[in-house]
Amino acid sequence: MDFQQGLITTIHDYGLGNNDPVAFRQELSRRPTALLIPCLMEEFGRPAIKLIREALSDLSGLQSLVIALAADSAEDVAAAEQFFAEMPFPVHVHWTNGPAVRELLLSVKELGLDVMGPPGKGWAVWQGLGIACQDAEVVGLFDADIRTFGPSYPERMLRPLLDPSHGIAY
């Protein structure tokens, strides 16, 4: 779900948030919730990812953050892990195009299912969802290049999914 697509929206600011960060954190702790951010290594050199990290740094109660990262090297992955090292919840940096993933996907292809696909954010999302869903009932997805990302974004995305009284269920 994305609420920053101009005229086309799926979840926007419907006034569901009560601007009570304590209550929101309690909701997060009642239902295991993860955030997934598909991202290219180049995005770590841009301001948006820093805004996202800053906004999420106060979000205790989150089960995990999954960064589905397209990177050129293990050093890039280590740099991404270091970038998110101080978060108040577990962060898993998944190397979407790393050797282990490529080997796994090639072995699946040999069995007759070609899931190699062209690398990109869509491919990263599918991989990241598998990881995020291991420990979470609710998964929110944000792009890594949202230049207006702020502290209200996680609540606006997740509150309708966390509270069944809003009438949104999957």
What residue spans do the PLM features occupy?
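Short beta-strand-to-loop acidic/aromatic patch adjacent to the donor-nucleotide binding site
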Residues: 135-147
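Active-site-proximal specificity loops/subdomain of glycosyltransferases
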Residues: 14-15, 76-136
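Conserved donor-nucleotide/metal-binding helix-loop-beta segment in metal-dependent transferases, i.e.
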Residues: 149-170
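Structural beta-sheet core signal
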Residues: 35-37, 65-67, 170
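Short beta-strand/turn micro-motifs composed of small residues
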Residues: 37-39, 69-71, 140-143
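Short beta-strand/loop segment that forms part of the nucleotide-sugar
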Residues: 61-73, 92-98
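N-proximal low-complexity "stem/linker" segments adjacent to membrane-targeting elements
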Residues: 1-58
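Short, charged/polar "capping" segments at the starts of alpha-helices
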Residues: 45, 72-79
